[in-house]
UniProtKB/Swiss-Prot annotation:
Pfam families: GDA1_CD39 (PF01150). It is found in: Endoplasmic reticulum; Secreted. N-glycosylated; high-mannose type. Glycosylation is not essential for enzymatic activity. Belongs to the GDA1/CD39 NTPase family. Hydrolyzes nucleoside diphosphates with a preference for GDP, IDP and UDP compared to ADP and CDP. In the lumen of the endoplasmic reticulum, hydrolyzes UDP that acts as an end-product feedback inhibitor of the UDP-Glc:glycoprotein glucosyltransferases. UMP can be transported back by an UDP-sugar antiporter to the cytosol where it is consumed to regenerate UDP-glucose. Therefore, it positively regulates protein reglucosylation by clearing UDP from the ER lumen and by promoting the regeneration of UDP-glucose. It comes from Homo sapiens (Human). One of its GO terms (cellular component) is extracellular region. The gene is ENTPD5. This is Nucleoside diphosphate phosphatase ENTPD5.
């Protein structure tokens, strides 16, 4: 098999990541992601597998990673990834936890088909829920996780203690940053020419980058900085997760649905929607009636005023992001694809101003709307406001939009699996 950047950097991360980290009361930032006492049960096998579930607000995704270790004690090589997903996410089953867990059961069949039976009992299965469950009442989130744990317990796979839990939002940002910068080769050697990462989910959004200026470090609020050592270098990351600022949560805020008690019989209206539209939308297990302004204004300007109220003054704006280079994925990528700004397979490079240009084009032609998402104008306007008025990016800031790097899904799952393998003792 030909050596790829993905292979090279996977080997490097397993051997070189150290956990000298200052985050959340001096604890290691990944403490709690995986149990450090997990036994290296399948270390002696020549082929290793890991099952990682990403339980997001809009869907549940499974990543089945395959690693090859040619000789005992030799560093494993990332050989491939099997990916699948289901919609809606677990949070949609807030009052039917058993039904929610059944969606995970279906994805476990993908793992069974991908992993030889002889390896099942040696392969760990882990589920990390993100913002969708963080938004739920604690007792309801726990009920969902309990049912998932029962599904895991009945499965033929290795189920370590703590394998089903809700992941902290900051960990999402850090692990995604590690994944992208390893796979793009930015952390090779002693260089620190890294790229920042922007992740826009359904319920939350994350921004992570390596500050280059002392001013940024001095002016950053407490809790936004995380230090760790890698390749004999210390990296101090700026990272923060904003709960409630994901794309779909922002729709509710824009519509004013978060300020209204009870949704029955109420239709939420917006200048971001086609004037004639009357529809319903389900998010987080709740049904919302929504529509366009039948008599009021519609179009980009009134729409932008609505989304601006959601973000203005509510996010920290580090000045140096205006000059940084960032990878953007999840809904940034999806909406750019939906509007033909980038290719679905290849991704592409955009400037922040490109999102505003497309938002104006879509919003000012709402009466010609015929297909696709009725929220397209609102989503593009929100992304523009989030980038410019939320994070403080300049119009000219360049964004690399991608779904995969070297054929591996972007996001936190691979970065989390690195730590899973370390906890299994594979790098020893």
């Amino acid at each position: 098999m030909a050596t790829s950047w993905g292979t090279v950097f996977f080997m490097l991360v397993v051997s070189c990541v150290c956990s000298a980290v200052s985050h959340r009361n001096q604890q290691t930032w990944f403490e709690g992601i995986f149990l450090s006492s997990m036994c290296p049960i399948n270390v002696s096998a020549s082929t290793l597998y890991g099952i990682m579930f990403d339980a997001g607000s809009t869907g549940t995704r499974i990543h089945v990673y395959t690693f090859v270790q040619k000789m005992p004690g030799q560093l494993p090589i990332l050989e491939g990834e099997v990916f699948d997903s289901v919609k809606p996410g677990l949070s949609a089953f807030v009052d039917q936890p058993k039904q929610g867990a059944e969606t995970v059961q279906g994805l476990l069949e993908v793992a069974k088909d991908s992993i030889p039976r002889s390896h099942w009992k040696k392969t760990p299965v882990v589920l990390k829920a993100t913002a969708g469950l963080r938004l739920l009442p604690e007792h309801k989130a726990k009920a969902l996780l309990f049912e998932v744990k029962e599904i895991f317990r009945k499965s033929p796979f290795l189920v370590p203690k703590g394998s089903v839990s809700i992941m902290d939002g900051s960990d999402e940002g850090i692990l995604a940053w590690v994944t992208v910068n390893f796979l793009t080769g930015q952390l090779h050697g002693h260089r620190q020419e890294t790229v920042g990462t922007l992740d826009l989910g359904g319920a939350s959004t994350q921004i992570t980058f390596l500050p280059q200026f002392e001013k940024t470090l001095e002016q950053t609020p407490r809790g936004y900085l995380t230090s760790f050592e890698m390749f004999n270098s210390t990296y101090k990351l700026y990272t923060h997760s904003y709960l409630g600022f994901g794309l779909k949560a922002a729709r509710l805020a824009t519509l004013g649905a978060l300020e209204t008690e009870g949704t029955d019989g109420h239709t939420f209206r917006s200048a971001c929607l086609p004037r004639w539209l009357e529809a319903e939308w389900i998010f987080g297990g709740v049904k919302y009636q929504y529509g366009g302004n039948q008599e009021g204004e519609v179009g980009f300007e009134p729409c932008y005023a609505e989304v601006l109220r959601v973000v203005r003054g509510k996010l920290h704006q580090p000045e140096e992001v205006q000059r940084g280079s960032f990878y953007a994925f999840s809904y940034y990528y999806d909406r750019a694809v939906d509007t033909d700004m980038i290719d679905y397979e290849k991704g592409g490079i955009l400037k922040v101003e490109d999102f505003e240009r497309k938002a104006r084009e879509v919003c000012d032609n709402l009466e010609n709307f015929t297909s696709g998402s009725p929220f397209l104008c609102m989503d593009l306007s929100y992304i523009t406001a989030l980038l410019k008025d939320g994070f403080g990016f300049a119009d000219s800031t360049v964004l690399q939009l991608t779904k995969k790097v070297n054929n591996i899904e972007t996001g936190w799952a691979l970065g989390a699996t690195f730590h899973l393998l370390q906890s299994l003792g594979i790098s020893h």
